[in-house]
Amino acid sequence: MSEQAPQTRWAQLTGGVGGSDYAARFEALAATGQDVHGEAAFCAALVPAPARVLDAGCGTGRVAIRLHDLGYDCVGVEVDESMLSVAVATETASSRPDWVLADLSTLDLDQHGIPGGFDVCVAAGNVIPLLAEGTLVRTVAALTATLRPGGLLVTGFGLDSAHLPGTCPVTSLAAYDSVCEVAGLELLVRHGTWQGTAFVEDQGYAVSVHRRSRS
């Protein structure tokens, strides 16, 4: 029997029942005219459709569904059943990404009949700091393994309490970059927002693009 993955910090904050509330928050933002597709637009600017994109920690499917609508071949992975159920209910007839219920720290797409070799793996929405304690190294290794040589790992997460939910601890960029280097990733570029603004050390948020070694 395989070892059970530890509880993510997201699950500790929400009790695993936060899907509907999370979706409602973005629906409210969209209703005010705010752009809620910055992450998808960022990824689309990196690689043209029909590239393969893995949405790691896809939540309610907002990013994966948007990219699928833009012509990308998308797979969404989420461990929170309440979030993934919203994703499945939200998809339209023309937008049906493949959904996988799995923990990122133990992710093995072969077990779900999905081949690797993704062009992009995106982990938005504070996925990295909301991982279970002590799982950053193996999660980054697992995500790197889903990429083709030269594929991109794209992450966006808060760097201080103002940009993180609840009592979620900070994952420093130094720690994250070190783990990425060990996994065979090199930093290509870092921005301060999903809109591509310049990164400033004390602004509290970073969007990072790392590339898997081509060897």
Report each predicted region and the residues it spans.
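A short glycine-rich, Lys/Arg-flanked "PGG" loop and its adjoining helix->strand segment in the class I
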Residues: V137-P149
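A short SAM/SAH-binding and catalytic strip from SAM-dependent methyltransferases
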Residues: D119-G134
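Class I SAM-dependent methyltransferase SAM/SAH-binding core
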Residues: T60-L107
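Short alpha-helix
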Residues: P169-G184, R190
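Conserved beta-strand signature within the Rossmann-like core of class I S-adenosyl-L-methionine
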Residues: G150-G158
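Conserved class I S-adenosyl-L-methionine
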Residues: M1-G59
